[in-house]
Regions:
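Bacterial N-terminal signal peptides
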Residues: 1-12
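A structural boundary/capping signal
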Residues: 14-336
């Protein structure tokens, strides 16, 4: 298999420490909460991840043609299906999907997919959309595993999403056990490799916040977190909190959603108090109560995540990741 380890510590954006640049606000035909309710209902009804992801993406960018994106995915799945030999097991079928995505051939119309080296920290929400990935053929640790899962489901594989700190990958059921598939490098990895590379604590493993195969509901929460990213810069922070509460009702262990809650309270604190600078006039009793409430809730949600085993991303990991990107880019330039 090709590629290097490309699990960016910010690919699944850690809401408290990085922010996508603001984009133009687009009027939505549906409220964020209504969208979330519809998406979670789709999961309960057994809809596949492709339909759920495209519904989320449509909220992010209303210009997206849902039918066109789903048609492209169906066509890809059918091309792969023609190459699956009779009796192929789960890992053999998975390998064919990875080959279709990564190896240049007439089979995939010479259109290979690769990691987006221009957005190594996944800061641009647009780059996490399936429509963007299908158009540019460059993805990240959100769009790449979701497309892999979408194709796997359409080909009858028992697949699901799983997470590591700030990262999403795929698990496939093979001979009664779950195997990890790393979509950003088109290969397989062990749980221990993920633990080492992303510094997963024993406490996090004990609390099962990472590496576990996610249910259909839990996978839909991972996909829907993009709506929280959208609301961070274009919506009200209270709406962001309401959406986060709805997602936590589906996956109480979603650390990423907890971080969004903590960050939303920080933004409220910043907007209502910190941005106004020091004042010679003391805060009113009501304002002081509000200030303390926002401060307390901000700390509570980050403390909640930490109590389950989440740890703040390490700056030295970010630096090593950027060095990996530079080496990868240099290698591509030499060979290209």
């Amino acid at each position: 298999m090709i590629g290097i380890w490309l699990a960016s510590l910010a690919c699944q954006t850690t809401a408290a420490y990085s922010a996508a640049p603001p984009s133009a606000t687009v009027l939505q035909a549906e409220t964020p909460l209504a969208t979330i309710d519809r998406i979670l209902l789709m999961a309960d009804q057994g809809r596949d991840i492709a339909a759920i992801k495209v519904a989320v993406d449509k909220f992010i960018d209303p210009r997206i043609n849902e039918a066109s994106v789903l048609r492209q995915i169906n066509e890809m799945a059918e091309r792969i299906r023609t190459k699956i030999p009779h009796g192929a097991d789960a890992m053999e079928r998975t390998a064919l999907i990875l080959k279709y995505l990564s190896e240049d051939s007439e089979w995939n119309q010479h259109q290979t997919f690769s990691y987006d080296l221009d957005d190594p920290f996944g800061t641009k929400l647009e780059n996490k959309l399936l429509s963007t990935y299908l158009r540019t053929r460059r993805g990240n640790c959100v769009s790449m595993p979701i497309l892999l899962l979408a194709l796997g489901q359409k080909l009858g594989l028992e697949m699901t999403l799983a997470t590591a700190p700030s990262h999403v990958f795929v698990k496939v059921r093979h001979n009664g056990t779950w195997k990890n598939v790393e979509a950003t490098s088109f290969g397989v990895m062990t749980d221990e490799s993920y633990r080492t590379k992303t510094h997963i604590s024993d406490l996090a493993i004990a609390n099962q916040i990472y590496l576990r195969p996610l249910s259909r509901r839990e996978s839909s929460v991972v996909v829907a977190e993009a709506i929280l990213e959208k609301l961070k810069t274009t919506g009200s922070q209270q709406t962001r909190l309401d959406v986060a509460d709805k997602l936590l009702s589906y996956d109480p262990k979603s650390v990423q959603t907890m971080l969004h809650k903590g960050n939303a309270y920080f933004h409220m604190l910043k907007n209502e108090f910190l941005d106004h600078g020091p004042s010679s006039t003391p805060l009113s009793t009501q304002s002081m109560l509000r200030y303390r409430h926002l401060q307390r809730e901000n700390r509570r949600w980050f403390s909640r995540a930490e109590s389950l085993g989440w740890r703040e991303p390490r700056t030295d990991d970010d630096q090593r990741y950027l060095e990996d990107i530079r080496r990868k880019r240099g290698s591509l330039e030499e060979n290209g």
